[in-house]
């Protein structure tokens, strides 16, 4: 197992524990981990679960989608900055 795979595995496991601790299925956690797309995003989700104690699956999924949207906005901003830097040089 590569170091990167190990990080992913550990982050996914933390999410599974957090989600099952509040009474939801491990399958939901696995799907969320895949959708979030990075260990840092997964850790943000785990932090949300521990702080907010969501009561419904909808609350979990809504936060997951918000995190994904923020990451996509950040990626687009970085791409735009890189394109602008290439254009200006």
Where are these regions (language model features)?
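Amphipathic alpha-helical segments that form the core helices of the histone-fold
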Residues: 30-43, 48-50
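N-terminal acidic leader/helix
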Residues: 2-35
